[in-house]
Amino acid sequence: MPSSTSEDITACTFIGGGVMARCMIDGLLDTYNNSVEIRVTARRSAHVGELATRYPTLVVSQGNISPILWDEPWHKLGKTPAAHVVLICTQPWATSDVCQDIRYVYSNYGFDPEPTFVTMCPGITTAQLEGWLPKGASVVRTMPNTPVAVRQGATALFANKVVTAQQASAVADIFRAVSPQISFIKQEDGIDIAASISGSSPAYVFKLLAILVEAGVSHGLAPDVAGALVKQSCLGAAMQALQDKRSLQSLIADVCVPGGSTEKAMQRLDEGEFSAVVAAAVEKSLDANRAMGKE
C-alpha cells in the first residue's frame, strides 16, 4: 500500500467499531496514514461518540446506510481511491443483516470502485455471503487473532473466485499493518481450521501461562516474579521457534536434557495425555466454528 501518489489511496470502510476494528484502524493509521482513508460505523450513539473522539479525522457513522458513509466522496488527495475494502467486523449473527444493508446501499448509491468485502466470522461461508451481498461480490474470509492488539497477529485468508490479484493484495496490506503472518488458504474449510488453531491459540497460551505462574506462586515465588519469568520465557520461546529453522520437536529436545527435570516434566504431560487433550479441544472448537454458519 504505497503512499507516493493519490492513485494509490485505499479506502477502508469498517462495519462495526469493536476491539478488532479499532486495533486494525490504529495499525492502518500508523502504518499507511497517507495512503489510506477510513470510515467506520457503530450501532449505538454512545459508541459513535467514543469513536469520533478517538478518531477525530475519520468519518464515523451511526448505522450502516447513512449517506455520509457511502454518498460522500472519498477526499484524501482529491482522488477516487484505487481500491475499496469493506470490513464486516460484527458478530456472526449480525452478518446477514449487515449484508442486507450493503445491498440497500448498492441499489441506492452504487460503489466506485467496486469494493472487496472482508469478513472475520468463522463458519459463515463465501456461498452464504455471495447470496446476501450484491451479485458478483468479491469476498475474502479472514481469521485474525487477538495479538493484532500489539500488531503481532496471525491472519488466515480465503478469497472467492471473483477476487482479483489487486484486490487480494489490498486486503493483505490492510492486515499486514497488524499481522506479520499473512496466509492465503486454498480450501475454504481451512479458514475454520485456522480459527481453531491460530484464532484460538492465544487462549491456549494464556491458559498455560496462568498455570505455570500459579505453580510458581504455590512453591513460593512472588506473583510478579513468576509472571515476569513465565511471560518472558514464552516470548523468547516463540521468537526462537520463528527464527530457528529446525523442527519444534528438535527445539523441545534441546530443553529436555536426558534424565533431567524438563524431560521428566514432559513425560508427566504425556502420561496425562496432554497432546490428546489439546487435540480434542481443537476438535471442539472446529465443530463450533463449522456450526456457526448453520445457526
UniProtKB/Swiss-Prot annotation:
Q: Which GO terms describe its molecular function?
A: pyrroline-5-carboxylate reductase activity
**EC assignment:** 1.5.1.-
Keyword rRNA-binding part of the UniProt annotation: no
Q: In which pathway does it act?
A: Secondary metabolite biosynthesis
Q: What induces it?
A: Expression is positively regulated by the apicidin F cluster-specific transcription factor apf2 that binds to the eight-base-pair motif 5'-TGACGTGA-3' called the 'Api-box' that is found in all promoters of the apicidin F cluster except in the promoter region of apf2 itself.
Question: What Pfam families has UniProt attached to this entry?
Answer: P5CR_dimer
Which terms are listed as keywords in the entry? Oxidoreductase
Disrupted gene: phenotype observed? Decreases 100-fold the apicidin F production. Leads to the incorporation of proline instead of D-pipecolic acid resulting in the production of apicidin J.
Q: How is it used?
A: Apicidin F, like the other known apicidins, is a cyclic tetrapeptides with anti-malarial properties via histone deacetylase inhibitory activity.
Signal peptide (UniProt feature, chain positions): none
List this protein's GO terms for biological process: L-proline biosynthetic process
Q: Name the family.
A: Belongs to the pyrroline-5-carboxylate reductase family.
Full protein name:
Delta-1-pyrroline-5-carboxylate reductase apf3
Task: State the organism of origin.
Answer: Gibberella fujikuroi (strain CBS 195.34 / IMI 58289 / NRRL A-6831) (Bakanae and foot rot disease fungus)
Q: Please state the gene responsible for encoding this protein.
A: apf3
